[in-house]
């Protein structure tokens, strides 16, 4: 025990000594604290603080033990039990005190020594630290002071520089101002001299003016004297003229008295003739008279207005106007007319045509609707001619009323205006017999009517039967000789027989004009003939012809003389006439709808209209007494005009009173072709007989129509186009063919004005005066040009008519043609060489007239039509080559030809100072103004007499056009520079794109120009990155500066204006407009920042990948160094990697590093050794002994999918992940030497894989790289194609985005949908290797107007790329689970029949479902292109009863054919039948699958009711010709895809059907044979959707698995399985049970994607 205690004791005492020794050594070791830095002092302080804390802990521990040690030391020696103390005691007693050291030293002394030493050290450290801190503070204060002094020094230096600059500017300004002031002083001195010189000149002029003024005063005094003398002479002449007027009035009074005497003689003669015996006419008809009452409206104007036509209704007001028809008895107080004459009252021409203003806008030739009234004190008789208009006549007339005839009935509105033209209004007495179908008919007319209508007692057009009593001759004794009367009878009979023979069997049209007048618009006007003096007495009618032999009798008979009675002109307008002992008042002429004066006895009693008879007329010609037989057709109606000229009716005034139905040739404005060219629409027979289309209104009058003298007849025949009558008259001798009426209208003028080309040709052949002008100076050429009768114009020009003749108002034929928009006439006149610069009295030129109408074609002809080189021989080829396209297509003619009109003509001002541009701008004719502006000599700043420019009077549209008049349209293009190299998938990426055209005006400033460029770029970026088709106008309201792809105005690197560089905000001394013109800048090019600048903006614009994503990719490469991009083939992986490498290279070079890009293409033969050599040669792998270089290396490995990643990169994974010398890797070179290498930290490795997903051993590599997946259904690939194609369309349309309904947009959207639907279907099929990136679709052609080009391109893409990939993918999947003997390669080379069938089915489904669906081409065009697609129509053959081990007898079943062509029609469905093959026990035990019979209807008809459709079947017998489970899975997926609601319904593509064909398999087991006759399917409401084309059901039993495919008529495709539920197995149900019709359908299947190994065999669950 003592030994243990002794061995322990020295240990306790040695520890304090060691501690004290260590402390002493530390104290002895001196070091200089002053040499330590601040950080070292802080570290020392922290160490010492830690040491002090440790020592404090030791002290505390020692204090705890002190008490125990003290007691032990003091009292331990007395403890006899302790052997240790005993030894100590012996030791102390054995030697001297000085030589002995206590065995156990007192710890307190040791502790106190330690504490004292620590305190000393602490005090010393504190002092040194305080000194160091004070020195540090002092140093920092000095540094702050120094910085403050430096800043102050800089400020003072900057202020000094500013002051110097300011002083320099002030000095320069002072120098400049001195120069300017000195120059101004010199200018002022010069001006002062000029002003003094002008002052002297003005003084001289003032003196001269004063002298001239005094001379003018003298001359004015002399002229006043002369005027006084002339006034006295005028007074003398006035007195003389008054005396002469008095004499004339006396003479007129004498003549009136003589007229009264003549009237009395006429009455006596009539009494004598009435007393003579006549034919069997009832006696009382002698006493019936109809008076013609004239009601004047101004002055002494009188009009004798009568009508002998049927009733006319006014459909506009639905008010029936009856003219005054009054039977009167002979009376001495009032003059009477011949028996059964008819009278009608019309106060004025305005009352005859109230409120009709159809042609007022036609200018000179087609004037206002107010007719010209005759001068006062002129007696006028309205000639009895039809006056037709396009609206019904407001004035109506009634048929004559014999005493024994039924009262007339008003005509219903539904009959008269059948052809938008009322029956004619006749305005003259008919001094002849009454109308046919009434008693008192002229026998000659009745004879003609007999041939025309058959029996007089036959029902008329409305079924009314009127009796015709024997007519009598109502003519008095004739003064003509019998020979003349005999000749007249013969000629009239022949003419009537010619006229009536073609019309014998045809019923006449009730109350309607002939078809020839349909569509014509004759203006309204007056129909009058002026009388001079006494009315002439007619020579009477020809003698009658017996009724039994109509038209053949030659027996003469004395005719009746016919007298015209003019009512005295002094009668007032409100005079009443006493008729039949009843006074009928004439209402005032101011009534708006005309006067309605009706005899109470003659009111209509029936509602059925009274229709006129068949036409038959007499033509009486004057003085020679020879009656000419012809039929004169009438198109009568005056032509009102606001200005004089071409507004008077032809032959409206005549010196003769002509008792005839054909009053004159009216001024007609024909519009329809038939009225312009009557011969074109009439039959040859009608034309030969003289019948003109406008004859019917005349012939409907119902009474005879005798004519007057030959000159008047000539004019009438020419005006009415009666070639027969005209030729007969021209063959007579002594006829003046140039005779003109009072208005100056000749026969040639009338024919030309009415467009009767044949009559014009006859008159010109007869040498009529071609340039004879009327009283207003209008020639026949003027009339024809104004009316648009271009054939007449051409004929007149051929006969050398004066084409530059100017009327009294200065109107030339060219001016009139332009005024009335007659393009053909303008063209003919210009080709004839007419003068385009002739001006009217108002200062108007033809250009003014053309612009005033707003007719662009007329203006283009005037400005650009050139005179042919060969004069009038202007053939069609020259016209086609020299005359431009009036429609103004893309090839603008004015861009090819220069205007032929001079600038003076364009800028000519009329009387008000208005140019043609003023007129076009004020009326808003923008097209005309644009044509004028294209003339280089136009002066838009010319002012009118009110000091207004064209811009001042223009409408808003025209103001905008004028503001852009001289604007430069310069295309703005975006350039991305060179895209290199082309093998990176950048073939289809365009380098330049036109985004818009900038309008640069004269007033455009550089600030406006900068804003326009920035806004155009922003709008373009937003438009191409939007979801829909936006135009640039649609995005201007969007204020966002950044587009979806991240580009903005800040992405610009530089801008060039032509070849001059420019930056946004920069200004030149010239304005943008002047700058562009001077430098001839044809385009503005914007260059985007690219990889050369370390940016990716140009890459974003070229590839349409958003900038944010590209920047993120670059960040990943810089951060991880190892990045692989993978996605479907064609996802632009190579392009992205190369552009990222370029950008990274330039960034590193900008930072001062050298950088190199190394590219390697990997193929199947690329080995690991080759990759090692690549890494070593590029200094990416560095030997451990070698020091690294500062060079940066970028390695690109392309097409990594062609080799095994795990084999190729396995040895490099670890050193790539840990790049340092601490983790080297040993590699063996090709020469057998091995060495340690490590990867350089400055090496970047990027790779590309054209594969949608990794599989198998390649997944081992995945964790060692950073992967970027480019999915087709996610950004950036999802929207890349849409953005790219939209940009291509915008570029094709020169920056203008078309509307969404444009065919180009539709075909582009179709191409986009094809890519999306194709990938969607391929993903559902579980063939990701067949997915396509957007690269293949970037080359989609955009050809406006040629959508078939895109379809042809799609067919080539389908046949060359898509179909082979799909075929390979389907075969690859179908052969994965083959038996060992059938490998994948063998399956691809020699596919089985089942695999071929599946491939063909897949191709057909994809084609119809993804490609052809949605094609915007019409069905007919699409049918033509369908055959170009591979797999569009195929027979799918399925072998029945196939066994997996070997073939049984059931394998000889027939092949089923399913034609998926959507183009064939088929009939009804045949009832599908089910057949079970004869299956051996072994076949049932093995894995079995039913035979797949595609009983298909290839119909894509429209949606029908599902309950009424017969279902289609999918027969799956015990073994399919498919060789594996995956083939069956593919079939099921194809079926499911056909019925998927998420996919497009191919039923929308076509509308055809195929006959359902059924092939029975060789089944011998009758028990397993089942026939389902009425297979129906209960479908929920959700199933009836346009996208769900198939629904299926599945059933299984204990024996075999049978698939029942129940489909709608909509689809011909295989039936899906994913949407059905399996029926529970029912052993009680036999296979022949018909209960399989009870089917449930699962609509909730959300399954859309299939994996490769997902579906197992159908019967595995039964095992």
Curated annotation (Swiss-Prot):
InterPro entries membership: Ankyrin_rpt, Ankyrin_rpt-contain_sf, Cortactin-Actin_Reg, Cortactin-binding_p2_N
Compositional bias segments (type: Low complexity): 386-396, 1624-1638
Coiled coil ranges: 119-276
GO molecular function: protein phosphatase 2A binding
UniProt biased composition (Basic and acidic residues): 1645-1663
ANK repeat residues: 709-739, 743-772, 776-805, 809-838, 842-871, 912-942
Keyword Cytoplasm annotated: yes
One Pfam family matching this protein: AAA_lid_NAV1
Protein localization: Cytoplasm, Cell cortex; Cell projection, Dendritic spine
This protein's GO CC annotations: cell cortex; dendritic spine; FAR/SIN/STRIPAK complex; glutamatergic synapse; postsynaptic actin cytoskeleton
Region (Disordered): 1-23, 203-222, 358-440, 454-479, 498-616, 1447-1477, 1581-1602, 1618-1663
Biased composition (Polar residues): 411-422, 583-597, 1582-1599
Keywords annotated in UniProt: ANK repeat, Cell projection, Coiled coil, Cytoplasm, Methylation, Phosphoprotein, Repeat, Synapse
Protein's job: Regulates the dendritic spine distribution of CTTN/cortactin in hippocampal neurons, and thus controls dendritic spinogenesis and dendritic spine maintenance. Associates with the striatin-interacting phosphatase and kinase (STRIPAK) core complex to regulate dendritic spine distribution of the STRIPAK complex in hippocampal neurons.
Subunit details: Interacts with CTTN/cortactin SH3 domain. Interacts with STRN, STRN4/zinedin and MOB4/phocein; this interactions mediate the association with the STRIPAK core complex and may regulate dendritic spine distribution of the STRIPAK complex in hippocampal neurons. Activation of glutamate receptors weakens the interaction with STRN and STRN4.
Official protein name in the record: Cortactin-binding protein 2
Species this protein is from: Papio anubis
Phylogenetic classification of the source organism: Eukaryota, Metazoa, Chordata, Craniata, Vertebrata
């Amino acid at each position: 025990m003592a030994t243990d205690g002794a061995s322990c004791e020295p240990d306790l005492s040695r520890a304090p000594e060691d501690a004290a020794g260590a402390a002493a050594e530390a104290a002895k070791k001196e070091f200089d604290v002053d040499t330590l830095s601040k950080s070292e002092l802080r570290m020392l302080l922290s160490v010492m603080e830690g040491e002090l804390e440790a020592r404090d802990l030791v002290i505390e521990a020692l204090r705890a033990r002190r008490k125990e040690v003290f007691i032990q030391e003091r009292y331990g020696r007395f403890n006899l039990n302790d052997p240790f103390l005993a030894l100590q005691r012996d030791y102390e007693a054995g030697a001297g005190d000085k030589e002995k050291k206590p065995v156990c030293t007192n710890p307190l002394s040791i502790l106190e020594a330690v504490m004292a030493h620590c305190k000393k050290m602490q005090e010393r450290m504190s002092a040194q630290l305080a000194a160091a801190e004070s020195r540090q503070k002092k140093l920092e204060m000095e540094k702050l002071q120094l910085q403050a002094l430096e800043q102050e020094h800089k400020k003072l230096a900057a202020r000094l520089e500013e002051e110097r600059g300011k002083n320099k500017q002030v000095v320069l300004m002072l120098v400049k101002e001195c120069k300017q002031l000195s120059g101004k002083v010199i200018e002022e001195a010069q001006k002062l001299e000029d002003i003094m010189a002008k002052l002297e000149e003005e003084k001289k002029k003032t003196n001269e003016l004063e002298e001239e003024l005094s001379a003018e005063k003298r001359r004015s005094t002399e002229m006043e004297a002369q005027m006084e003398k002339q006034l006295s002479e005028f007074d003398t002449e006035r007195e003389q003229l008054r005396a002469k007027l008095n004499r004339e009035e006396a003479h007129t009074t004498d003549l009136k008295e003589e007229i009264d005497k003549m009237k009395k003689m006429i009455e006596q003669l009539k009494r004598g003739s009435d007393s003579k015996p006549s034919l069997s006419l009832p006696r009382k008809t002698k006493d019936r008279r109809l008076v013609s009452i004239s009601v004047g409206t101004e002055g002494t104007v009188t009009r004798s207005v009568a009508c002998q036509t049927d009733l006319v209704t006014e459909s506009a007001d639905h008010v029936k106007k009856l003219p005054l028809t009054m039977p009167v008895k002979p009376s001495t107080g009032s003059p009477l007319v011949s028996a059964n004459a008819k009278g009608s009252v019309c106060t004025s021409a305005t009352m005859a045509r109230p409120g009709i203003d159809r042609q007022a806008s036609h200018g000179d030739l087609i004037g206002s609707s107010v007719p010209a009234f005759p001068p006062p004190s002129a007696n006028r008789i309205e000639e009895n001619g039809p006056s037709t208009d396009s609206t019904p006549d407001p004035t109506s007339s009634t048929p004559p009323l014999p005493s024994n005839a039924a009262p007339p009935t008003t005509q219903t509105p539904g009959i008269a205006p059948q052809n938008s033209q009322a029956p004619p209004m006749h305005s003259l007495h008919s001094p002849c017999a009454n109308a046919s179908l009434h008693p008192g008919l002229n026998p000659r007319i009745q004879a003609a009517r007999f041939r025309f209508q058959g029996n007089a007692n036959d029902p008329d057009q409305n079924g009314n039967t009127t009796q015709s009593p024997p007519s009598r001759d109502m003519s008095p004794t004739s003064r003509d000789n019998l020979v003349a009367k005999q000749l007249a009878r013969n000629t009239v009979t022949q003419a009537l027989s010619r006229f009536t023979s073609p019309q014998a069997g045809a019923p006449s049209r009730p109350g309607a004009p002939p078809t020839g007048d349909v569509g014509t618009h004759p203006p309204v006007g007056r129909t009058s003939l002026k009388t001079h003096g006494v009315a002439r007495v007619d020579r009477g009618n020809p003698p009658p012809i017996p009724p039994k032999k109509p038209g053949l009798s030659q027996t003469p008979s004395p005719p009746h003389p016919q007298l015209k009675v003019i009512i005295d002109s002094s009668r007032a307008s409100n005079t009443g006439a006493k008729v039949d002992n009843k006074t009928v008042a004439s209402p005032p002429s101011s009534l708006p709808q005309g006067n309605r004066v009706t005899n109470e006895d003659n009111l209509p009693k029936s509602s059925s209209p009274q229709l006129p008879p068949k036409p038959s007329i007499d033509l009486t010609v004057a003085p020679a007494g020879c009656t000419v037989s012809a039929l004169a057709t009438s198109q009568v109606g005056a032509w009102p005009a606001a200005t004089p000229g071409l507004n008077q009716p032809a032959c409206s005034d005549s010196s003769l009173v002509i008792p005839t139905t054909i009053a004159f040739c009216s001024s007609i404005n024909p519009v329809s072709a038939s009225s312009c060219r009557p011969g074109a629409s009439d039959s040859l027979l009608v034309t030969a007989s003289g019948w003109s289309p406008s004859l019917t209104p005349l012939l409907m009058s119902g009474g005879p129509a005798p004519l007057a003298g030959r000159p008047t007849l000539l004019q009438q025949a020419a005006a009415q186009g009666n070639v027969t009558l005209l030729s007969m008259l021209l063959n007579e001798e002594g006829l003046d063919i140039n005779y003109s009426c009072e208005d100056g209208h000749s026969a040639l003028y009338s024919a030309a004005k009415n467009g009767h080309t044949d009559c014009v040709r006859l008159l010109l052949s007869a040498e009529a005066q071609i340039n004879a002008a009327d009283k207003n100076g209008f020639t026949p050429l003027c009339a024809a040009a104004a009316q648009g009768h271009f054939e007449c114009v051409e004929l007149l020009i051929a006969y050398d008519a004066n084409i530059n003749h100017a009327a009294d108002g200065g109107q030339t034929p060219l001016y009139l043609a332009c005024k009335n928009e007659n393009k053909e006439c303008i063209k003919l006149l210009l080709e004839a060489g007419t003068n385009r610069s002739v001006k009217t009295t108002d200062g108007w030129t033809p250009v003014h007239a053309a612009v005033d109408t707003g007719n662009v074609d007329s203006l283009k002809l005037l400005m650009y039509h050139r005179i042919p080189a060969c004069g009038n021989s202007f053939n069609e080829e020259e016209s086609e080559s020299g005359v431009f396209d009036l429609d103004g297509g893309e090839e603008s003619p004015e861009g090819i030809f220069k205007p032929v009109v001079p600038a003076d003509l364009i800028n000519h001002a009329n009387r008000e100072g208005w140019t043609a541009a003023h007129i076009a701008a004020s009326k808003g004719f923008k097209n005309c103004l644009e044509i004028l502006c294209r003339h280089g000599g136009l002066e838009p700043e010319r002012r009118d007499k009110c000091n207004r420019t064209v811009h001042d009077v223009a409408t808003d549209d025209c103001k905008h056009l004028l503001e852009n008049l001289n604007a430069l349209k310069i295309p703005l293009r975006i350039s991305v520079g060179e895209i290199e190299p082309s093998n990176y998938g950048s073939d289809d990426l365009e380098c330049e794109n036109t985004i818009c055209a900038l309008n640069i005006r004269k007033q455009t400033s550089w600030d406006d120009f900068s804003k326009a460029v920035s806004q155009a770029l922003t709008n373009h970026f937003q438009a191409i990155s939007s979801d829909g088709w936006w135009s640039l106008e649609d995005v201007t309201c969007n204020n966002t500066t950044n587009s979806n792809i991240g580009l903005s105005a800040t992405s610009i690197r530089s801008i060039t204006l032509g070849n001059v560089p420019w930056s946004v905000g920069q200004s030149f001394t010239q304005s943008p407009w002047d700058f562009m013109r001077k430098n001839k800048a044809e385009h503005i090019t914007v260059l985007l920042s690219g990889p050369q600048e370390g940016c990716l903006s140009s890459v974003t614009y070229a590839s349409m990948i958003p900038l944010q994503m590209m920047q993120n990719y670059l960040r990943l490469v810089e951060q991880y160094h190892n990045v692989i991009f993978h996605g479907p083939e064609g996802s632009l992986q190579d392009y992205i990697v190369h552009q990222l490498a370029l950008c990274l290279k330039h960034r590193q070079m900008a930072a001062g590093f050298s950088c190199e890009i190394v590219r390697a293409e990997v193929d199947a033969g690329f080995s690991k050794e080759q990759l090692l050599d690549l890494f070593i040669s590029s200094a990416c792998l560095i030997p451990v002994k070698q020091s690294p270089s500062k060079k940066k290396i970028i390695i690109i490995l392309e097409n990594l999918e062609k080799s095994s990643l795990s084999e190729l990169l396995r040895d490099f994974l670890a050193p790539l992940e840990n790049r340092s010398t601490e983790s080297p890797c040993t590699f063996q070179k090709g020469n057998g030497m091995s060495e340690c290498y490590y990867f350089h930290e400055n090496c970047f490795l990027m790779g590309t894989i054209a594969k949608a997903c990794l599989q198998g051993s390649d997944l081992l590599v995945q964790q060692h790289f950073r992967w970027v997946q480019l999915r087709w259904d996610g950004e950036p690939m999802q929207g890349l194609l849409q953005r790219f194609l939209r940009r291509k369309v915008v570029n094709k349309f020169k920056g203008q985005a078309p509307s969404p309904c444009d065919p180009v947009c539709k075909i582009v959207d179709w191409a986009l949908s094809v890519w999306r639907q194709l990938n969607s279907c391929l993903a559902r099929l579980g063939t990701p290797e067949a997915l396509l990136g957007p690269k293949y679709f970037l080359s989609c052609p955009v050809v406006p107007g040629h959508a078939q080009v895109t379809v042809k391109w799609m067919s080539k893409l389908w046949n060359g790329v898509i179909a082979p990939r799909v075929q390979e993918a389907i075969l690859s999947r179908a052969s994965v689970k083959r038996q060992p003997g059938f490998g994948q390669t063998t399956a691809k080379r020699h596919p089985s029949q089942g695999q071929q069938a599946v491939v063909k089915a897949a191709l057909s489904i994809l084609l119809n479902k993804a490609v052809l669906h949605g094609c915007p081409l019409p069905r007919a065009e699409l049918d033509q292109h369908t055959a170009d697609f591979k797999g569009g129509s195929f027979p799918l053959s399925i072998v029945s009863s196939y066994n997996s081990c070997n073939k049984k007898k059931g394998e000889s079943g027939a092949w089923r054919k399913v034609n998926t062509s959507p183009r064939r029609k088929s009939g009804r469905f045949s009832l599908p039948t089910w057949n079970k093959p004869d299956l051996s026990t072994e076949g049932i035990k093995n894995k079995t699958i039913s035979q797949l019979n595609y009983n298909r209807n290839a119909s894509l008809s429209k949606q029908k009711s599902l309950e009424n459709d017969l279902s289609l079947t999918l027969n799956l017998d015990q073994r399919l010709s498919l060789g594996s489970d995956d083939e069956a899975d593919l079939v099921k997926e194809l079926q499911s895809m056909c019925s998927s609601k998420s996919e497009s319904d191919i039923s929308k593509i076509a509308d055809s059907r195929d006959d359902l064909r059924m092939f029975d398999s060789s089944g011998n087991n009758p028990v397993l044979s089942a026939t389902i006759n009425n297979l129906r399917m209960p479908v929920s409401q959700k199933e009836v959707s346009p996208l769900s084309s198939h629904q299926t059901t599945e059933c299984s039993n204990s024996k075999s698995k049978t698939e029942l495919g129940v489909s709608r008529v909509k689809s011909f495709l295989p039936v899906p399985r994913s949407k059905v539920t399996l029926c529970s197995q029912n052993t009680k149900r036999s296979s022949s049970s018909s209960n399989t019709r009870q089917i449930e359908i699962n609509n909730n299947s959300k399954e859309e994607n299939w994996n490769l190994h997902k579906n197992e065999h159908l019967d595995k669950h039964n095992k």
